[in-house]
């Protein structure tokens, strides 16, 4: 743990969810000497689900502050080259990943979600604070405290409840239930609108495969087709992390969304077995070398209400996007860093943890995060549709416009990375690059004028599409 100012205000935080978001927040609070527990509904913290994460410099710097980045980096190799293939067989390569590392000191890395959770758990200093098999059934709030009830009959009391329990968040459901009970009919309609904010238009097959000749470690491939895309990342010892994004025939509204099984994944990969990935490699090769695979519906949505009294959300429970831009773990880390910084400031102040002071902290957290997350979410939303060539304009820009403006993309990307938050009360890591200072003072990173490039071409092309829409590069662009 780091040396922090003396705590004056006793705080107890209940984190629901042993996710990347939840464990990152737990690390932050441990460093701030803030009392906390983690409640995880599953029997283990790091199950193998066939999923993987991309970590960019904005997330990497926070993980470095927490002392876990070196362990993450040992498990993989940095991405140094990006390769892109279009349906007509035309392809090109980009050095953008290497250039980003040179500017910011951290590479782009990709590794198993299971391994990230395992490292976060193993490096956590107070494992007795983490409780598994704790399914939340109810949250109660009073003027003085919040109470979390679990299926085994236990009751946990604290000053604040944090929902880091993912898209199917029990904390979010309880927050909505309480809000509906306390508001009038008109406001209740607003709550119902929030409940329906998550939608599904895409499904995704996630897989990890043993080495495939022609897919080199440290490289990343984007293969675009009409209605689907195949994206691969090649890690340590040639392991291949991949996903296939498929546009569904109809739009679903959460929670009435489709569920998929391993047999569904097999059918999809059989149907698209001949879709090219890179060179002579096709989807059949990814499937033939698979070591794990899963298929899921991809929820998309960003809620406007992040808190209610002593309850607050972070990570996928509040903002959910497709994996094309690889920003989920990075955004969750930013959420955790900002919330922990505000709680640390409260804990070292002369204020007590009253309902008013807690509400002020949570309001500031939502205010600081919303615009940046909104910008990221919109680019992910557009990127998925660009990747799958959702219409003629996206197909044209991705194919003919994007490759010509790589330097502009790198500059805008650098501005966005440089504006990322970190954990305020922890030292900035010595490992760094000139980009953090060279691009400091750029427009507010959460503003819609700043594009956000994360793990692959989708975001690059998304930005260029918006540049085309705005006619010239010097005018503000949206998302």
From Swiss-Prot:
Lipid bilayer topology: Single-pass membrane protein
Name the cofactor(s): FAD
Name a single GO biological process.
Answer: secondary metabolite biosynthetic process
Q: What Pfam families is this protein classified in?
A: FAD_binding_3
Q: Spell out the InterPro entries in the cross-references.
A: FAD-bd, FAD/NAD-bd_sf, FAD_mOase_fung
Following inactivation of the gene, the phenotype reported is: Impairs the synthesis of austinol and dehydroaustinol.
- A single Gene Ontology CC term: membrane
Going by the UniProt record, its keywords in alphabetical order are:
FAD, Flavoprotein, Glycoprotein, Membrane, Monooxygenase, Oxidoreductase, Transmembrane, Transmembrane helix
Report the EC code(s) recorded for this entry.
Answer: 1.-.-.-
Identify the pathway: Secondary metabolite biosynthesis; terpenoid biosynthesis
Membrane-crossing residues? 449-469
The record's active-site residues are: 224
Q: Where in the cell is it found?
A: Membrane
Q: Which residues bind FAD?
A: 40, 54, 113, 316, 329
Molecular function terms in GO for this entry? FAD binding; monooxygenase activity
Sugar-bearing residue positions: 289
First-level EC class: oxidoreductase
Answer whether the UniProt record assigns the keyword RNA-binding to this protein. Answer: no
Q: What does this protein do?
A: FAD-dependent monooxygenase; part of the gene cluster B that mediates the biosynthesis of austinol and dehydroaustinol, two fungal meroterpenoids. The first step of the pathway is the synthesis of 3,5-dimethylorsellinic acid by the polyketide synthase ausA. 3,5-dimethylorsellinic acid is then prenylated by the polyprenyl transferase ausN. Further epoxidation by the FAD-dependent monooxygenase ausM and cyclization by the probable terpene cyclase ausL lead to the formation of protoaustinoid A.
> Any other comment in the entry?
In A.calidoustus, the austinoid gene cluster lies on a contiguous DNA region, while clusters from E.nidulans and P.brasilianum are split in their respective genomes. Genetic rearrangements provoked variability among the clusters and E.nidulans produces the least number of austionoid derivatives with the end products austinol and dehydroaustinol, while P.brasilianum can produce until acetoxydehydroaustin, and A.calidoustus produces the highest number of identified derivatives.
Give the family this protein belongs to, as stated in its UniProt record.
Belongs to the paxM FAD-dependent monooxygenase family.
Q: What is this protein called?
A: FAD-dependent monooxygenase ausM
Organism for this UniProt entry: Emericella nidulans (strain FGSC A4 / ATCC 38163 / CBS 112.46 / NRRL 194 / M139)
This chain is encoded by the gene named: ausM
């Amino acid at each position: 743990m780091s040396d922090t100012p003396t705590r004056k205000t006793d705080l107890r935080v209940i984190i629901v969810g042993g996710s990347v978001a939840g464990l990152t927040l737990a690390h932050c609070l441990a460093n701030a000497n803030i009392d906390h527990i983690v409640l995880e509904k599953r029997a283990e913290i790091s199950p193998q689900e066939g999923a993987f994460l991309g970590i960019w410099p904005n997330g990497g710097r926070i993980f470095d502050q927490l002392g876990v980045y070196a362990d993450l980096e040992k498990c993989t190799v940095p991405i140094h080259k990006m390769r892109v293939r279009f349906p007509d067989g035309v392809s090109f390569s980009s050095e953008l990943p290497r250039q980003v590392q040179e500017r910011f000191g951290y590479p782009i890395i990709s590794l198993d979600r299971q391994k990230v959770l395992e490292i976060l758990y193993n490096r956590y200093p107070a494992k007795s604070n983490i409780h598994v098999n704790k399914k939340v059934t109810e949250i109660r709030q009073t003027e003085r405290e919040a109470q979390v009830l679990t299926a085994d009959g236990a009751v946990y009391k604290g000053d604040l409840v944090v929902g880091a329990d993912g898209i199917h968040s029990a904390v979010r459901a309880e927050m909505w239930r309480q809000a509906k009970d306390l508001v009038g009919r008109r406001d209740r309609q607003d709550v119902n609108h929030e409940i329906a904010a998550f939608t599904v238009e895409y499904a995704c097959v996630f897989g990890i495969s043993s080495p495939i000749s022609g897919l080199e470690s440290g490289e990343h491939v984007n293969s675009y087709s009409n209605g689907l895309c195949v994206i691969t990342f090649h890690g340590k010892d040639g392991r291949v992390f991949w996903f296939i994004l498929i546009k569904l025939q109809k739009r679903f509204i959460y929670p009435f969304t489709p569920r998929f099984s391993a047999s569904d994944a097999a059918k999809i990969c059989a149907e698209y077995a001949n879709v090219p990935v890179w060179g002579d490699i096709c989807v059949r090769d990814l499937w033939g070398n698979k070591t794990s695979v899963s298929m899921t519906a991809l929820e998309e949505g960003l809620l406007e209400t992040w808190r209610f009294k002593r309850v607050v959300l972070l990570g996928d429970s509040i903002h959910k996007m497709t994996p094309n831009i690889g920003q989920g773990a990075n955004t969750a880390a930013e959420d955790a860093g900002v919330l922990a910084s505000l709680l640390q400031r409260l804990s070292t102040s002369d204020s007590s943890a009253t309902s008013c002071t807690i509400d002020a902290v949570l309001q500031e957290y939502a205010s600081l995060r919303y615009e940046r997350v909104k910008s990221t979410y919109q680019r992910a939303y557009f990127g998925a549709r660009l990747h799958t060539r959702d219409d003629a304009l996206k197909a044209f820009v991705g194919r003919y416009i994007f490759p010509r403006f790589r330097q502009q993309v790198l500059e805008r990307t650098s501005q966005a990375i440089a504006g990322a938050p970190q954990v305020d009360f922890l030292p900035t890591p010595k490992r760094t690059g000139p980009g953090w200072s060279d691009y400091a003072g750029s427009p507010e990173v959460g503003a819609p004028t700043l594009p956000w490039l994360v793990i692959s071409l989708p975001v690059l092309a998304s930005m260029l599409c918006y540049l085309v829409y705005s006619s010239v590069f010097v005018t503000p662009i949206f998302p």
